[in-house]
Amino acid sequence: MAKHSKRSASIFRYPVLLAFSLFFVGLFALDLVTPDRAYSELENTTLSQRPSLSSFSADGLNKFFTASTKYVKDQVAGRDNWVALQSTVETKVMQKEQSGGILLGKEHMMFPRTYGLVSSETRTLPKNTAALESLCRRYPGLVNVMLVPAASAVYPENVPAGAPLLDEDRYLDALSEAVQTAGGRFVDVRQTLADHKGEYIYYRTDHHWTSTGAYYAYQQLCTALGLTPFDPSVHTARTAEGFYGTHYSKARTPDAEPDTITYYDLPNALTIYTVTAPGQPAEGETTGLYDTDKLSVYDKYAMFLHGNNGLSRIKGDGTGRGRILVIKDSYANCFVPYLTANYADIDVVDFRNYNYGLDQLIADNGYDQILVLYSFDSFKSDPYLYRAGAAG
């Protein structure tokens, strides 16, 4: 009995060790009763699931334990709070100017850390450039290309001093020359955005431009095509507060300044097609321009055009004529609604969910203009844009 008392007393001589032991035992117990999550809305990422014993026998010991380690990390109880705590320690205690691969700049702006083209981009960028050139040659005089610079290129003074930045100007200059040589029009929005940098043209916590930034670029396109721009003053602007974007999902800084999404209340119909073959599909589901249910979830930007559908068609407001085809990434989602003032039909293709070439679709619809609208960051890395260059 005396020995047992001495052993118990010796444990309490090390209160820190005891506290840590109890903490990890409690965390382990909490993990056992906490359901696994398939997706982290806050981080906008898929979470690892428990590896099966079949993967142990098929892939070997190392792969099984690697998968198990990632599973434990992704499914730890209170993961969102742990990520936030790590960010707080890094930025407030250690005074780091980056967190989760995101640079923390002035004016509460966040920027991705970019040293240069990664290995895959050195292969993808030339392929996508060649695809643009091919599209311009196949449809001379119809193709307009708009590649949007990153916020860091417009606001270099807000990026932390000495931070790595990709020289986008060098690549955009080369792309401009390539497009024009191939018979297309390069709509260079760099100066336009720089002229309006005192306004809210990029989100602070997200990688997209705002509806205001998109509008200034849209005005420049209208000037190039001889069109009368959409008039915001005759439409009702709606706002959604409390938007935290993709940069925040990675950085999770405690003092992040939330963004505001603005959109115009437009009645235009949008048809999302079921695409099973090249050309114009016959069947689709018709809805409105915006999925306003998304305004009550974390990824509010997904409300524009109901996300990144493979092929959709928007009806104009009745004042415009002709048809335009927009080949795009998500930067175009807040841009496209403005085109309702200029065209009777606006067809929108996103190659992430459209697995065919464009020639049959173009032949079926006889477009008056084609617009390729991407952020440069997406253009240099998109593994699907090569389809624009494929004949057929």
Protein language model annotation of sequence segments:
Residues 1-392:
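Extracellular glycan-modifying ectodomains
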